[in-house]
């Protein structure tokens, strides 16, 4: 269970004051400087760590919500500097917190009693949110006939609230008119747990936006001018995306897989697509079907909207979504599969086309 690679904090070198020399961290730091990404170290740690915490939560809850399951085992929650450098911890090698999650937050999903909300993560606003409420209870004193206190918030507003002994709830979503992220809070006898649910409204696609899908079309717009979306067919030296990061170590199991992503979530391109700085499950299928390209070698100034966090054995500054101007053209390079038939893909396409067709671009 777990063992998701978190980008190593190479600045821990100064904490090694004994007999062990952190030659691995020293090599990684030199490689980062060589690839001109060392200044992004803190962002890389936070983004990859945020993803690792989300996945640990999902893994642990999957075990807890499985009937008659005998529990779970974690190899460790700290980094392991042996076996090719496995920086897989929520704690560093000195067993100190990386600041990714607090003790109380971790206990919400890995404690003696854990409220569970069994539901999908992605919905359309024409759907009804069907969820099962449950309680994993391994405490010394069992909670008989638990009362589930459920609150669903849309931003700061309460969207739905109930206190019930029933194990199932049905929540219509048709009052939601703009794609949004809902926060779910479930509390039982002082034990609390939280989740995020994404609801996508009917989307508007701007069909008059130019899509560049070939080198010939790209050369033409650069020469003659205009603005357009450049699709992944034009990405040179493509780097395949992935929501799930490298397992254990990219040295032990060679991989070009990234370790998360950093999103400019205040960018106007996301006016109609709910997101925060680091990806949640609304990005899973999108990232799994995406490609990026090495923006450090790109001609012209590049403004990344989404930047993937490379693994420390690769350190390529890659992006699946960025803006640039080349020649007379203003271009949005998009490595996502915009033809996908699922709500989050359609909504991303809608948000992107509306942005490109506006004076914001």
Where in this protein do the model-derived segments appear?
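Substrate-binding clefts and catalytic carboxylate motifs of secreted carbohydrate-active enzymes
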Residues: 1-146, 304
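Solvent-exposed loop/turn segments at secondary-structure junctions
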Residues: 2-4, 79-80, 215-217, 234-238, ...
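Soluble or luminal CAZymes and related metallo-dependent hydrolases
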Residues: 48-55, 312-314, 344, 348
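Beta-strand-rich binding/interaction modules
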Residues: 128-173, 179-189
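Low-complexity, Pro/Ser/Thr- and charge-rich linker/hinge segments at domain boundaries
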Residues: 195-215
